[in-house]
UniProtKB/Swiss-Prot annotation:
ATP binds at residues 154-209. This is D-alanine--D-alanine ligase. PROSITE patterns: ATP_GRASP, DALA_DALA_LIGASE_1, DALA_DALA_LIGASE_2. GO terms for cellular component: cytosol. PANTHER family: D-ALANINE--D-ALANINE LIGASE, D-ALANINE--D-ALANINE LIGASE A. It comes from Shewanella pealeana (strain ATCC 700345 / ANG-SQ1). Binds 2 magnesium or manganese ions per subunit. Pathway: Cell wall biogenesis; peptidoglycan biosynthesis. Mg(2+) 2 binds at E296, N298.
Amino acid sequence: MTQKNLLLLCGGGGDEHSISLLSANFFEAQLATLPHFNVLRVELNAKGQYHTQAGELCELTNSQQLRFDDETKAPWNVDYVIPCIHGYPGETGDIQSYFELINLPYFGCDSESSSNCFNKVTAKMWFSALGIPNTPYIFLSEFNQQSLEQAEAALAKWGSIFIKAASQGSSVGCYRVDSIEQLASSLEEAFTFSPYVVIEKTITARELEVAAYEADGEIIATKPGEIICASNTFYSFDEKYAENSQAQTVIEADVDEAIAKQIQEYAIKAFKGMKLRHLSRIDFFLTEDNEILLNEINTFPGQTQISMFPKMLQNHGHNFAQYLSGNILAQLKS
């Protein structure tokens, strides 16, 4: 078959820029095994500039071409894009909106589903509307005395809370608060990351993850894996990506079969209900009373050496490169 020009777009310039580059390494290695794709890796920096690995500045135009600042270099026609960008502007749906505007096909969830999942306010509304249990919560829209009083009431009611910036991923702007002394500073800090803040009841629970994705025309939800953190800690940004992280990952969690099946059913319900596409990682809590609570959905999960998504996909029996190729080719034919 004729080779397709595939743009591997990474970085993004946000808080998760460096992690996006690590994930791009994985995608690049997988794509190298697929001869029908001609891959060009381009990084998007914090200034909104595109540049190749050789440092060449370029621009993605509305004619579906990469045009280079060096006008002696011919434009590069783009057939397809993998937006390997965690956080803004990838998982927020912003970059997908541009692709949709210029009719450029791309891998992953569309702009609306990405935005709905990334924003914790809309995500929780969707979880509840779909009838999927999730953690008790309140929303705040600005840092003022009224919000502080609402947060104090939540802390008094629940004993321990998580304060989360509504529009951030990978636990950026996320703080556990166990005492009134921590409250004001944590709330104020969270508002520096997002105009909206979610306050959730702290749940003493196991942290389980499911890879939910499309393969061979069907939606798959793997058996849940597990994140095991040190006592009295949570899976923070540092715990996810630091070399000295104490968190442990288990690809197939030791849970009752009926519980695993229920989690998988919730994952597929969320995938279908929120109209996700190609890939996602859906995170759950499992309490000591075996209550299942949906925590969050990642529409472009990490693909680093320690990331759960590619490991769970492989454990389920799928080859990542073939899974990737199948989705891309099916979309290009449609």
